[in-house]
């Protein structure tokens, strides 16, 4: 640092040194200035003009427009430290006092302009104290702090939860970060690394006890000698350090129980595109986008939570389904509810802002409007005897009290905080401010009548203020209480004690009014905050009614049916549809319905058939329908019986992971290993084209072994799509062959997208390649090679390429003949498969005649 640096710049550098990971907004007058590296980065990110003063790079933004610039930086995953200046200058030669009053970062924002109304904004902390691993999360805008305890193996659960909560920021120890950086891909996030010694059990206990004002952490379900709670301490400590003097509105810690919810690992969440698609990572084309027709921000966030946390308890699921069915059967009730709910505001986030003393008048008006809607919802539900209520008698009284307070106290007028009639002093000051000229005129009339000076006037000059003006002809009539203040050629100017007092009152009225209004406004806010618990109950109630009425609306609109949940090992779906594909195909093409039948005896389905025939859609739709049933939604099918499913594993498609040095095949094997290690007989396994990333023989061997392992060891309900047609020969009592139906019309194939119970012995890959636009020369050569492969299966590679060499003719006749060969090949393979299964030692003459008739029929097709 230069010795001749100014005192203010020394002050800046001292403050910046304490906030190295943030862009420092340094208040200078009416601007926030950035210097040095912050100026270089800020000018680039915010599009600001970069200047220099004494070779110091600098740029700045006006304080009154700073919010927009801060928002841009937050969206770019930057932290912003707000440094304000005080009015005190302790050293006459030094700068004004300055201090950082708040550090705004992506994980701790509460300003509604920085948030998406339908997405929670999570800050996460991961604790690795000794062998006690835990995952705490909070959306500060709703003030809900939760914790997940990991007992035993934790890495797969941690991957699941990082994907589920999609945090804006993560807090971890330095040692944990570098140990698991690649395994958890932590570089995707804004990560705050703390020294490992900061994870101190005793400090955490004291800090949490002090914050929650409790004698023991057992109040939250913790054992103090099992320090899982350290992750919650990390979150609270981080928020307090960032928000400085703001009140922290965290009043409890919720311990999540894994046993209550279906396990969906990170890969499954991604492959099923539950809340975001895999293309641009937005909600469009996700299950959430199809199921979200909620009317409130709270309902939208609750729907996301339901989708990512399907229930396992049949009673809890049926309770939701009962409410959905009731609303589905009472269409008028459902319509009226949704109309009322459209007037509900995000009071869950509003009350959190009130608790942190970051509020505006509109927040109180939104609470009032929401409570009006709440009363209407309650009255409507009572009329229809709808049996959902989470409030007690005291709650209802408190809710009415909150409404009355806001209705009586908060003004609807744009330039007023407090309503007329609530406070007499505010009324007086407002009257004085708004009618100052009338008060002056009234006093002038009084003095005119008293003095009989008809030409008496009251004038105002900025320097002298208000004064009476009397002309020469009336000097003799000037009352004794007039105090002469100035004599001019033709007039004299006077003041009175009353006029001085009136002027002072008028001048002070606006300032006093603003001050008193703010004081009363803050008192009202404190009164409302006392009832934050019951307001959060109202938010919870509105969110739930919103979600179940939304489910009922979608069920009626999309012809969904109520699923039956059982404790049996079964999935029986009649004429099921893929909810997302169907939704986005509307008006373009009718969706082909397919059925699924899996039970305790036949629980493994192998699905074969060509690409483009709909295998992946069939797999995904089965998983999505099962999941929808577990969240209490009606489902897209004519009939649905779903056995409780503890886990869904979905391995569909794969890509390489360059950052980890993992090939596509290795990624596929990692995902498969996770399934085989963690699936149970109550799980649903969805696997597509396992083994395709290596040699044919290796892939076939691996796929076959996986199928056998699932059949014999795991015994989970499974849908396994493959192009290894050899797998269809597996002989097992629980094994079922399914294929995608196709129809041949001349040399063309029609993909019917229907599932039938039989194997497909050909993938029609060359046909698909042709319609994809592969050059005809390549297609014809592929047909020649295919013929050789089919007729000489046992040749070694070198022999094969020698024998398969031939001149490729460009004529169309040859092309059609070659294409026809691939189509005929499937018929031949089906016929061969049928004949090979005939047991001539155990067949009656009648059965033999029927088989011969079937063979003759197939040869004519």
From Swiss-Prot:
GO terms for cellular component: cytosol. GO terms for biological process: mismatch repair. CDD domains: ABC_MutS1. GO terms for molecular function: ATP binding; ATP-dependent DNA damage sensor activity; damaged DNA binding; mismatched DNA binding. It comes from the Bacteria. ATP binds at residues 609-616. Pfam families: MutS_I, MutS_II, MutS_III, MutS_IV, MutS_V. Belongs to the DNA mismatch repair MutS family. This protein is involved in the repair of mismatches in DNA. It is possible that it carries out the mismatch recognition step. This protein has a weak ATPase activity. This is DNA mismatch repair protein MutS. It comes from Borrelia hermsii (strain HS1 / DAH). The lineage of its organism: Bacteria, Pseudomonadati, Spirochaetota, Spirochaetia, Spirochaetales.
């Amino acid at each position: 640092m230069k010795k001749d640096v100014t005192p203010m710049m020394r002050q800046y550098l001292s403050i910046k040194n304490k906030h190295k990971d943030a862009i420092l907004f340094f208040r200078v007058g009416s601007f926030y200035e950035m210097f040095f590296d912050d100026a270089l980065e800020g000018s680039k990110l915010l599009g600001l003009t970069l200047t220099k003063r004494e070779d110091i790079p600098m740029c700045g933004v006006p304080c009154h427009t700073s919010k927009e610039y801060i928002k841009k930086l937050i969206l770019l995953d930057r932290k912003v430290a707000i440094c304000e200046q005080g009015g005190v200058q302790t050293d006459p030669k030094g700068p004004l006092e300055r201090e950082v009053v708040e550090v705004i970062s992506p994980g701790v924002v509460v300003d509604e302009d920085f948030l998406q109304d339908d997405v929670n904004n999570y800050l996460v902390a991961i604790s690795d104290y000794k062998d006690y691993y835990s995952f705490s999360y909070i959306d500060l805008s709703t003030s809900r702090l939760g914790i997940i305890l990991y007992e035993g193996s934790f890495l797969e659960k941690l991957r699941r939860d990082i994907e589920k909560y999609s945090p804006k920021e993560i807090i971890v120890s330095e040692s944990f970060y570098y140990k698991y950086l690649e395994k958890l891909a932590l570089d995707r996030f804004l990560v705050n690394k703390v020294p490992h010694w900061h994870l101190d059990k005793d400090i955490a206990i004291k800090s949490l006890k002090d914050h929650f004002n409790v004698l023991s952490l057992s109040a939250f379900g913790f054992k103090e000698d099992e320090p899982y709670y350290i992750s919650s301490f990390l979150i609270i400590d981080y928020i307090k350090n960032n928000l400085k003097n703001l009140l922290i509105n965290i009043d409890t810690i919720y311990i999540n129980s894994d046993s209550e919810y279906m396990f969906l690992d990170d890969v499954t969440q991604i492959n099923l595109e539950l809340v975001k698609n895999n293309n641009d990572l937005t909600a469009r084309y996700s299950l959430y986008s199809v199921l979200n027709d909620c009317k409130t921000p709270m309902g939208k966030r609750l729907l996301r939570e339901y989708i990512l946390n399907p229930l396992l308890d049949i009673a809890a699921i049926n309770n939701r389904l009962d409410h959905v069915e009731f609303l589905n059967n009472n269409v008028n009730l459902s319509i009226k509810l949704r109309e009322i709910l459209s007037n509900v505001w995000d009071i869950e986030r509003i009350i959190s802002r009130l608790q942190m003393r970051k509020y505006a008048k509109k927040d109180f008006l939104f609470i009032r409007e929401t409570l009006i809607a709440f009363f209407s919802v309650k009255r409507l539900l009572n009329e229809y005897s709808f049996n959902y209520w989470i409030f007690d008698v005291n709650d209802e009284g408190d809710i009415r009290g909150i409404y009355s307070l806001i209705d009586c106290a908060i003004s609807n007028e744009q330039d007023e905080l407090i309503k007329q009639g609530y406070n007499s002093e505010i009324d007086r000051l407002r009257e004085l401010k708004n009618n100052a000229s009338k008060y002056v005129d009234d006093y002038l009339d009084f003095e005119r009548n008293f003095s009989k000076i008809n030409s008496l006037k009251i004038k105002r000059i900025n320097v002298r203020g208000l004064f009476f003006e009397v002309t020469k002809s009336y000097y003799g009539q000037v009352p004794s209480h007039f105090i002469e203040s100035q004599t001019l050629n033709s007039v004299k100017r006077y003041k009175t004690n009353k006029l001085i007092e009136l002027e002072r009152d008028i001048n002070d009225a606006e300032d006093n009014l603003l001050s008193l209004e703010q004081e009363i406004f803050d008192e009202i806010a404190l009164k409302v905050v006392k009832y934050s618990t019951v307001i959060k109950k109202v938010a919870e109630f509105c969110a739930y009614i919103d979600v179940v009425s939304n489910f009922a609306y979608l069920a009626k609109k999309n012809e969904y049916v109520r699923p039956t949940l059982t404790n049996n090992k079964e999935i029986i779906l009649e004429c099921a549809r893929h909810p997302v594909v169907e939704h986005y195909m509307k008006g373009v093409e009718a969706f082909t319905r397919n059925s699924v039948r899996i039970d305790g005896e036949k629980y493994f389905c192998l699905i074969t058939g060509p690409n483009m025939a709909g295998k992946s859609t069939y797999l995904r739709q089965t998983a999505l329908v099962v999941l929808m049933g577990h969240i209490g939604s009606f489902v897209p099918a004519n009939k649905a019986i779903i056995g409780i499913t503890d886990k869904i594993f979905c391995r569909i498609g794969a890509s390489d992971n360059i950052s980890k040095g993992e090939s596509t095949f290795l990624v596929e094997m990692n995902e498969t290993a996770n399934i085989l290690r963690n699936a149970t007989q109550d799980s649903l396994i969805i696997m597509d084209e396992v083994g395709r990333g290596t040699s044919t023989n290796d892939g076939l061997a691996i796929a076959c072994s996986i199928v056998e392992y699932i059949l014999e060891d795991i015994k989970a309900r499974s849908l396994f799509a493959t192009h290894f047609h050899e797998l269809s020969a597996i002989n097992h009592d629980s094994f079922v062959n399914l294929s995608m139906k196709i129809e041949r019309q001349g040399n063309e194939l029609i993909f019917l997208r229907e599932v039938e119970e039989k194997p497909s012995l050909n993938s029609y890959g060359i046909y698909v390649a042709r319609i994809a636009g592969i050059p005809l020369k390549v297609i014809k050569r592929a047909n020649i090679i295919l013929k050789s492969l089919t007729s000489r299966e046992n040749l070694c590679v070198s022999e094969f390429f020698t024998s398969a060499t031939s001149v490729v003719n460009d004529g169309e006749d040859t092309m059609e003949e070659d294409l026809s060969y691939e189509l005929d090949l499937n018929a031949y393979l089906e016929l061969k498969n049928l004949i090979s299964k005939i047991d001539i030692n155990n067949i009656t003459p009648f059965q033999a005649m029927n088989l011969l008739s079937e063979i003759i029929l197939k040869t004519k097709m």
